[in-house]
Structure formats: structure tokens, C-alpha cells
């Protein structure tokens, strides 16, 4: 008897709107305000500025009656809508789906379970599969997972599969790339205006190209694999205006650590982060990637940098696919503006165990370290190594702690051995690293950024202190649960390697 | 007919509970009469059925109707703090396990929360050598599930036998993965700091119809935010199961 009022209540609750995932992403975005840490960084302030209209080209998507942000416009087009509002749930057509060896096998398992053993993927040219996480390991299950990817790609005739078979010598695998986010960019899969989803939280990296890109789980990816669509909630946008000349001792990593320290690790949950201003315009594509790569560390759904001539130039020899960049309308609604004068910033670190645990590098000069790690999607690109080499070159000294170098991709590795470092009289990064006493650059992969199998190169198997150019300093992230990770720019990482303490790179760069 | 659709108690649909837990929970019946009164009219009946056959398998049919039925969880809680990232829920070295393979799914359950620092969390979530946890509810703080998008995280929690997390807020991808897989109910609290008032091992009830959390050990009652439209999706077993059940996609695979 008592069950009837219950059922009635229940149906009232649930009959409101029962569409699939109507609120899949509607958990409260309410979390931001109460976590503001007290930072001792009074000099560096993010000032909320009144809305300012940056100089932007007009919309390229026709009607501007309903002003939209870049992210809203991309999702509007992908959902075949003329306009939409933050908070709406829309079915989005996906341009590229990326998966890798850690989440690919599970995604494939779900795809087969739900669509059938003989099902075909929605578009064999729009799925990019990149083994990158656990490659150079004797872990049998890890090796098996790459085999699962290979079998699936053969079966489905997947066009872009960056395979590796000879684990003894990565160079014997011309198709092998390495870290997926960097490979996606280098291989021309990142294009302005498009929607890229991937089974990796750092998929937001591709926002550097002025596209919508975000990380999803295996189940969602299995759905996309079969249908080419996904239900997404349109995020509202936070705007970050970075102006001022970038000091020679700063890198994009400092900028994003500054921002995350300001808004906390949950400050952008369910939100888009748009980066603009004269500093952003001056950044290279790789630096823009560093900026967007870590938006997930602030909880962001995606990050975007408006495409410009730097973007178009980068893409020139990488893709023949036509793309259509979009830009925020002048009167688009941003839920908040943050303004930074970059010329006043100083080199930063994120102390253990949270990416928003911001401090000035110089404030941590007494922190003794055991090792330095330069690598990952965030900090293992060509320019990241060039930056580290610049510090080693300027110092002329040798490192005092083991310094591990893990190029993100095969292309980056080639650059380390081929490109001359500016001001070095023609030396390559690899020569400079050797002279400085670093470990030899190893095979490209995600490496020890996320710990990985026990035999992963440079995995932190002891409770040590590491300065790292990676993206996360959670407990156990690089292996040992009690390890301590200081996230830093390649400049700061190299400077710290030279002293054995967390070190402000100005000690060597000025 | 009113009794034809019994209020549904979801416990673990994946793993059998240990008999110890069942026994321990039934003793907690004693706490029930002290529940605050406003809730009684709504939930008295379900609570009885919830406590007696505590971990009896949920009625497997009747699920279409059960969108509106009770979903209640009862048992020991495991308490964690703010910003519990997915590396702590399931460290990356275990990501070689593929959740869609049944034996590896079970293994993931045995490893849930193994990444928590031992100094802060001396009680393991899953006892070494066991596949499932004796804790049925996880209570956490702000930004639960942040970091990596690994779906292994909600899967590990679900595979351990726990079906509900109660936290102040969730990281986006984790929340979505909970719903997409149907592994875990990610429920939000109305107030902050509940995790500071609860202790691992407290006996709690989470009532998703009355939207409250009762800590029987401490004699406290907390409001929860409604799970909303995500509830039926999780109850169905994830987005694919929900879409089939509601006729959005055809019921059999090709």
C-alpha cells in the first residue's frame, strides 16, 4: 500500500524529462567559490576586468543576430543548429574520434558488445588510433592491448592507426608516433572549427587550433564509434585575456599554472576556457597547446584559442581537409573575464599534490629534489626541449640530479637530434643534453608521466621529489604513492636539474 | 497492485556480498526508529524492505516501472576528502586491465581506491586478497573524480560492489562516466563538509527518493541534491541499456 505514494512521487520526479542523458552532464557547476586558497602571491593578481571587446574578425558563420562564443558556434554547427545557449544538450556530429592503448580496448569492447561483433565503425577515416601509453614495457597485458588495437584496425580498415610492432627499436616503426595529443597535431588531425573527442582527458590540447576538443570515457567513445554522434551539454565560457610582453624566462606552462592557481582545480568545471589577448597571439602553436592541454586541470570541458595566421601556417603542410575557423562574436556572453598582465608574472610551480597548489619557483628554492622529468603531452614537445636546452646552454654546467628526457613523439625525437639550438653554434638539443649530463632521450611515449607499468622508463619507484614538465602532481601519479611532484615549465625544470633544488630559471637566463 | 512493484533496493548487482556484511547490516535495524519523522511517510516501507533482505538481489524485472521506485543504499561508508582524483581511485599501472573483459572487470574492483595514500587512509577500501569491498557508500568532498578521464575509475568502484558516491561536487568526466556506464550513482550533497562529520565504518543509508543521507552511527541526517534525469539511466545500467529500454535504439545488436 505504502508503495503507491512512493511510485507516484517517483514518477513525478522522473517524468519531467527523460531523454537520454538529459542531465548526464548537468551535475551542479556550483563548486567554484569556496575553494579559493590564500596565496602568498600578492604581486601576481588576476583581476576581473569589465568586459572588453577584443579586436576580432567578424563571424564566419553567417547570421550574428544571436551572439555566440567560439565554443557555442562550433557546437551549433556540429549539431546543425543556427544558434544555441549554454546549458542546452545537443547531439553533436563528431569530426574525429581518438583513442589509445589504455582506453581503446575497452572502447572496442563496448562497441562490439553494443553494436554487434560484425558491426562497422561509423567512419573508418574519422577514427584515429594511437598507441602511446604503455609501449616500451614487458607487461604482457599492456602488449596485448596494443595487439587488440591492431586487430581491430585491420578488421575495420581504420585509416589512421599509428602502429608499433618492434618494441626494441621504435625507429624501426615508421608509422609509430607517440603521445596521442601531440601526434594528432603533428599529423594534421587538429583543425579549426571541428569537434574532436578522445578517450583521454588531455584531448582538450587540440583547443589550441580553435576547435572543440574534450575527453570522454570508453562508453561514450563506444557510442561515438558506432554512430559518429554524442550528446553534449553546451558549456558557458570563461574568458582569459592575457596581455603584455612575455618575459624571456616564462613559458606557456607558467601561464596555465597561474590560471589554475587562480581559479582552482574545479574553477572551470563544466565550462569552456577561451584564451586571447596579445600574449596569446604571440604564442607558437606548441605553446598554445600547453595552455589548452591543462584546462582539464582546472576542471574545464574544453579550452580554445582563436585560430589565426600562426594556426594557418602550422596547418599548411599538415592537412588538405578544408576547415572553417569560427570566432566569438563581439557581444557574445562570457560568464566571467580574467585579465592578466603577463609582463608582471614570475616563473611558477605547482607544489604537491595538486595542480592548483601554486607557488613562485623562487619561493621553493629550499626544496631539495631527487630528479627532473621532461616529457609528456604537456611538456615533451620540440619547443619544450629547446627551452630546456637553452637553460643548459646558458649555464654551461652539468645537472646535479638524474634528468630524464622523454620526447612526446618520434618527430620530436628526430628534432632533438636534428634541429640546431639557437645561439649554440649549431649544436642540437641532444648534444647539449649530453654535455649537461642528462639521460639520453628515450623512446617516445607517455612514459612515466602517469607512472605506468613497473618497468616504465623513469617511473618514480621510490618516494622521491621530482620537478616535472608534466600535467599532474597527484599522489602516486608518477609511480610511488609518496613521491612529490613539482609541476613546472621546461625552463624551471632545467634550472632545477642544474642546482638540485627547485630553481627560478632567471638564475641562468639573465 | 500497489505492492506489485516493490521498492527496489540496489546493492551490488555485480558481486555477492559477504555474509558478514549482511549480518552487520541487519543489526543496524536498531537505529531505524530514530529516523527523523518527515521522512517516514515517504520511505517507511521501502526502508523496511531495504533493511531486511539487505543484499538480496534486486528484483530484476519491474525495472521500467522502477524509474519512479525507491533506490536506497545501506551499509558501511568509506570517507575520503576533497579532490579525490582518478589516479587515487585506480592508479595508472592498473589501466592495462580492460573493463569490458569480465575477469579484468573483477580485478579492477579489487583495486578500487588502492592509490589513496596509506598514511591518510589506513583502512583499505578493499581488503587485500578480496575482490569486493565491505563499504557500500563512499562519502567525499569537493571535485570528486578529477583528473584522468579513465572510465576504469567508476568501473572499479562499481566492480568493488559500492554503488553510490556522495560528494559535494564531481569532476565532469567522472560524473559522466558514472552515468554512461551505470556503475555508480554520483550524488551531490546540499551542504559542504559532511565528509568531515562522517567516519569510515559508520553505518549509513542513502535514500535517492527522499534525497537524504542518514548516518546511523552518528545519528545525523543530511540533505542530498536530487540525482535527476541521470537516475533512470544509471538504474537501467548505463546509456546503452537505457536507450534500448526506452526504445531510442533497437533492442538487439546486429
List each language-model region with its residue ranges:
Chain A
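Fe-S-dependent hydro-lyases/dehydratases of central metabolism
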Residues: 2-510
Amino acid at each position: 500500500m505504502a508503495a503507491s505514494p512512493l511510485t507516484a512521487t517517483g514518477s513525478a520526479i522522473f517524468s519531467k524529462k527523460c531523454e537520454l542523458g538529459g542531465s548526464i552532464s548537468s551535475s551542479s557547476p556550483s563548486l567554484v567559490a569556496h575553494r579559493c586558497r590564500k596565496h602568498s602571491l600578492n604581486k601576481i593578481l588576476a583581476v576581473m576586468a569589465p568586459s572588453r571587446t577584443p579586436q576580432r574578425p567578424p563571424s564566419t558563420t553567417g547570421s550574428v543576430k544571436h551572439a555566440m562564443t567560439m565554443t557555442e558556434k562550433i557546437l551549433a554547427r556540429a549539431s546543425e543548429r543556427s544558434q544555441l545557449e549554454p546549458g542546452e544538450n545537443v547531439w553533436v556530429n563528431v569530426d574525429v574520434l581518438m583513442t589509445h592503448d589504455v582506453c581503446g580496448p575497452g572502447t572496442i569492447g563496448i562497441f562490439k558488445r553494443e553494436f554487434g561483433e560484425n558491426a562497422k565503425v561509423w567512419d573508418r577515416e574519422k577514427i584515429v588510433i594511437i598507441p602511446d601509453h604503455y609501449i616500451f614495457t614487458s607487461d604482457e597485458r599492456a602488449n596485448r592491448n596494443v595487439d587488440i588495437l591492431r586487430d581491430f584496425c585491420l578488421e575495420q580498415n581504420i585509416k589512421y592507426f599509428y602502429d608499433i610492432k618492434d618494441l626494441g627499436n621504435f625507429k624501426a616503426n615508421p608509422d609509430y608516433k607517440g603521445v596521442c595529443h601531440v601526434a594528432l597535431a603533428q599529423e594534421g588531425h587538429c583543425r579549426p572549427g571541428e569537434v574532436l573527442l578522445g578517450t583521454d582527458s588531455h584531448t582538450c590540447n587540440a583547443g589550441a587550433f580553435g576547435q572543440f576538443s574534450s575527453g570522454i570515457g570508453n562508453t561514450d567513445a563506444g557510442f561515438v564509434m558506432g554512430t559518429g554522434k554524442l550528446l553534449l551539454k553546451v558549456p558557458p565560457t570563461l574568458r582569459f585575456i592575457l596581455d603584455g610582453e612575455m618575459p624571456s624566462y616564462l613559458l606557456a606552462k607558467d601561464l596555465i599554472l597561474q590560471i589554475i592557481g587562480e581559479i582552482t582545480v574545479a574553477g572551470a568545471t563544466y565550462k569552456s576556457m577561451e584564451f586571447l589577448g596579445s600574449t596569446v597571439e604571440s604564442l607558437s602553436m606548441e605553446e598554445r597547446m600547453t595552455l589548452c592541454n591543462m584546462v582539464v586541470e582546472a576542471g574545464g570541458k574544453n579550452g580554445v584559442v582563436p585560430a589565426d595566421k600562426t594556426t594557418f601556417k602550422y596547418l599548411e603542410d599538415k592537412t588538405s581537409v578544408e576547415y572553417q575557423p569560427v570566432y566569438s562574436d563581439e557581444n557574445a556572453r562570457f560568464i566571467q573575464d580574467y585579465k592578466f598582465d603577463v609582463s608582471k608574472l614570475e616563473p611558477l610551480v605547482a607544489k604537491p599534490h595538486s595542480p592548483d597548489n601554486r607557488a613562485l619557483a623562487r619561493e621553493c628554492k629550499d626544496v631539495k629534489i631527487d630528479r627532473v622529468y621532461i616529457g609528456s603531452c604537456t611538456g615533451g614537445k620540440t619547443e619544450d626541449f629547446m627551452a630546456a636546452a637553452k637553460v643548459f646552454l646558458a649555464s654551461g654546467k652539468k645537472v646535479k640530479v638524474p634528468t630524464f628526457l622523454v620526447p612526446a613523439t618520434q618527430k620530436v625525437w628526430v628534432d632533438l637530434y636534428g634541429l640546431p639550438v639557437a645561439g649554440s653554434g649549431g649544436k642540437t638539443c641532444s648534444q647539449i643534453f649530453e654535455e649537461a649530463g642528462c639521460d639520453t632521450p628515450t623512446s617516445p611515449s607517455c612514459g612515466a608521466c602517469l607512472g605506468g607499468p613497473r618497468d616504465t622508463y623513469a617511473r618514480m619507484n621510490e618516494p622521491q621529489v621530482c620537478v616535472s614538465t608534466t600535467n599532474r602532481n597527484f599522489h602516486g601519479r608518477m609511480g610511488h604513492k609518496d613521491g612529490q611532484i613539482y609541476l613546472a615549465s621546461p625552463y624551471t625544470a632545467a634550472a632545477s636539474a642544474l642546482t638540485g633544488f627547485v630553481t627560478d630559471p632567471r638564475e641562468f637566463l639573465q | 497492485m500497489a505492492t506489485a512493484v516493490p521498492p527496489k533496493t540496489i546493492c551490488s548487482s555485480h558481486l555477492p556480498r559477504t555474509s558478514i556484511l549482511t549480518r552487520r547490516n541487519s543489526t543496524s535495524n536498531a537505529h531505524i526508529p530514530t529516523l527523523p519523522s518527515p521522512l517516514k511517510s515517504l520511505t517507511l516501507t521501502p526502508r523496511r524492505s531495504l533493511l531486511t533482505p539487505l543484499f538480496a538481489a534486486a528484483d530484476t524485472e519491474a525495472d521500467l516501472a522502477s524509474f519512479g521506485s525507491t533506490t536506497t543504499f545501506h551499509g558501511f561508508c568509506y570517507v575520503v576528502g576533497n579532490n579525490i582524483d582518478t589516479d587515487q581511485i585506480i592508479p595508472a599501472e592498473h589501466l592495462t586491465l580492460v573493463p569490458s573483459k569480465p575477469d579484468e572487470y573483477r580485478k579492477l574492483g579489487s583495486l578500487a581506491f588502492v592509490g589513496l595514500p596509506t598514511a591518510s587512509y589506513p583502512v583499505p577500501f578493499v581488503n587485500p586478497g578480496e575482490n569486493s569491498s565491505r563499504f557500500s557508500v563512499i562519502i567525499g568532498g569537493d571535485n570528486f573524480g578529477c583528473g584522468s578521464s579513465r572510465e576504469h575509475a567508476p568501473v572499479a568502484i562499481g566492480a568493488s560492489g559500492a554503488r553510490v558516491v556522495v560528494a559535494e561536487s564531481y569532476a565532469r568526466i567522472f560524473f559522466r562516466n558514472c552515468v554512461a556506464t551505470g556503475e555508480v550513482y554520483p550524488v551531490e550533497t546540499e551542504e559542504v563538509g559532511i565528509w568531515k562529520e562522517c567516519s569510515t565504518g559508520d553505518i549509513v543509508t542513502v535514500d535517492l527518493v527522499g534525497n537524504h543521507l542518514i548516518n546511523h552511527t552518528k545519528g545525523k541526517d543530511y540533505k542530498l541534491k536530487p540525482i535527476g534525469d541521470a537516475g533512470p539511466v544509471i538504474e537501467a545500467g548505463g546509456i546503452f541499456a537505457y536507450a534500448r529500454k526506452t526504445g531510442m535504439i533497437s533492442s538487439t545488436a546486429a
